[in-house]
Design a protein with these regions (language model features):
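Catalytic core of membrane glycerolipid acyltransferases/transacylases, capturing the structured
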Residues: 1-78
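A short, hydrophobic secondary-structure junction motif
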Residues: 5, 37-56, 91-95, 99-102, ...
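Conserved glycosyltransferase catalytic-site signature
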Residues: 9, 88, 115-119
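Internal catalytic-core helix/loop-beta-alpha segment
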Residues: 64-111
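Short, amphipathic alpha-helical "lid/cap" segments that border enzyme active or binding sites
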Residues: 88, 92, 156, 172-180
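A cross-family acyltransferase "interaction/gating" segment
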Residues: 96-101, 106-174
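Short amphipathic C-terminal alpha-helix that caps PH/PH-like domains
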Residues: 118, 175-186
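Short, highly charged C-terminal tails/helix-capping segments
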Residues: 193-200
Length: 200
C-alpha cells in the first residue's frame, strides 16, 4: 500500500519505465523518460486530487478519480455511501488501455484492511494482478510525499509474481486475503517473533 500521497506514484512511473527500457535496480540517468510508457493510470480519491495545485496537475497524468464510500475529508464516515458506477467503468476503460495502479487499502496507514471494492474489480474485470511491496517512503517523506523528512533511507519496490486467482470460484473474501498476503499487509505479518525462535 502507498505510504505517501504522491512520492510513491511518481517513483512507480520511474521504476516501470526504467525496467521497460532494460534497467535493473536503477533509475539513474533518466534517458528512459524520452520514450515513456504513457498508458499507466492510477486510482486516487477525488477529494485528494482536488486539494491543491499539484494534485490537480497530477490528475492530468493518468488519475482515475473515485469517490471513497467510507471516508470523507480525512475522516471515516458512519454511513457508507453507494459506489458510483462511473468510477468502476472508468477503471475498466483504463484496464482495457493499459496498466492500472491501485492502493487496495485506500490509506497511507499500514495494516488497514484491503477494501472489498478492489476484490470486486478484480473479480469483475479479471486483470492480471501484480503485487508490489513498498518500503521506505513513510520514513523518508511527509504524508503528502512532497517534503523529505530524513535522508539516507532506502526506498524500495519489490515487484512480485502475478497472483493466482480463480476468477470464477474465488470469493471476494478469498481475493482480499490473497491481496493482503501478497502486499504483506495481512494481520499475521504483525505478529512478533519471540527472541528464542530467532536464536534457534
Amino acid at each position: 500500500n502507498h505510504q505517501t500521497y504522491f512520492a510513491d506514484v511518481v517513483a512507480m512511473f520511474h521504476v516501470f519505465n526504467a525496467s521497460l527500457s532494460g534497467r535493473g535496480n536503477s533509475i539513474k540517468n533518466v534517458t528512459y523518460l524520452w520514450n515513456p510508457k504513457l498508458n499507466i493510470y492510477y486510482v486516487a480519491a477525488k477529494e485528494t486530487m482536488h486539494a491543491g495545485l499539484l494534485p490537480k496537475i497530477m490528475a492530468y497524468a493518468g488519475a482515475i478519480t473515485v469517490e471513497r464510500t467510507w471516508r470523507s475529508c480525512g475522516k471515516d464516515v458512519t454511513e457508507k455511501r453507494e459506489v458510483n458506477p462511473d468510477d468502476t467503468e472508468n477503471i475498466r476503460i483504463a484496464l482495457d488501455d493499459g496498466w492500472v495502479i491501485t492502493f487496495p487499502q485506500g490509506t497511507t496507514k499500514s495494516f488497514k484492511p484491503v477494501r472489498k471494492g478492489t476484490a470486486h474489480i478484480i473479480k469483475q474485470y479479471r486483470p492480471i494482478v501484480v503485487p508490489i511491496v513498498i518500503d521506505g517512503f513513510r520514513r523518508s517523506f511527509d504524508k503528502k510525499g512532497l517534503r523529505m523528512k530524513k535522508k539516507g533511507i532506502k526506498q524500495s519496490f519489490v515487484i512480485k509474481k502475478p497472483l493466482e486467482i480463480d476468477y470464477d470460484n474465488d470469493t471476494i473474501e478469498e481475493i482480499v486475503e490473497k491481496v493482503e498476503f501478497a502486499i504483506e499487509q495481512h494481520p499475521s505479518f504483525l505478529k512478533v517473533v519471540p527472541a528464542e525462535e530467532i536464536e534457534n
